[in-house]
Amino acid sequence: MSEKNPIVGLCQKASFLISAAQVDQCPPDEGLEVAFAGRSNAGKSSALNTLTHANLARTSKTPGRTQLLNFFALDDSRRLVDLPGYGYAKVPIPLKQHWQRHLEAYLSSRASLAGVFLMMDIRHPLTDFDRLMLDWAQASQLPIHVLMTKADKLAFGAAKNALLKVRREVQQGWGDVATLQLFSAPKRQGVDEAQMVLAQWLGLLDEEQEAFEEA
């Protein structure tokens, strides 16, 4: 599946574009972009690298960029955005307020933002950070796809039960915008499913369908 998914070849061409501390520093709001969010230690970097077949997260971790929105160009009209992954409960209140203000502004104002991938550690799901992200997505009617990461840390049955439990709560509170799946970067579990979501949000599946119909 991965070899046929158009997102793979496109992501291998990804290049760092710009880092932004606030919305007015972001690239022009045109085309399509997909953002990646996750609390510290939720596996965001591993998921981003695994889905894109590129070491994009390494760029985001360079000094001075860890608390910024990091943009990567896939082509002239498509981008990925690595959002800051704070140890949410541990950051100083002023920094937390600054981050909340600018991240909420980004999520609510970017017309080009097609969706958000939210990484949740399957062993510690629905943290305050996760709920905040889901609330913001719902307020903006923004699609959000939850990757329940580190699924390999639990036995298969336990992982499925955890998914069902979280899915019930998410559907009750944020079901109109949120979808969920199991994910493990080391085992490559759920990679194809997540890549299809990414390709759909970036309009790649529409292009493939148009090319097929024209042929």
Swiss-Prot record:
Its cofactor is Mg(2+). It comes from Pseudomonas aeruginosa (strain ATCC 15692 / DSM 22644 / CIP 104116 / JCM 14847 / LMG 12228 / 1C / PRS 101 / PAO1). The gene is engB. Belongs to the TRAFAC class TrmE-Era-EngA-EngB-Septin-like GTPase superfamily. EngB GTPase family. InterPro entries: G_ENGB_dom (IPR030393), GTP-bd (IPR006073), GTP-bd_ribosome_bio_YsxC (IPR019987), P-loop_NTPase (IPR027417). CDD domains: YihA_EngB. GTP binds at residues 38-45, 64-68, 82-85, 149-152, 182-185. This is Probable GTP-binding protein EngB. Pfam families: MMR_HSR1.
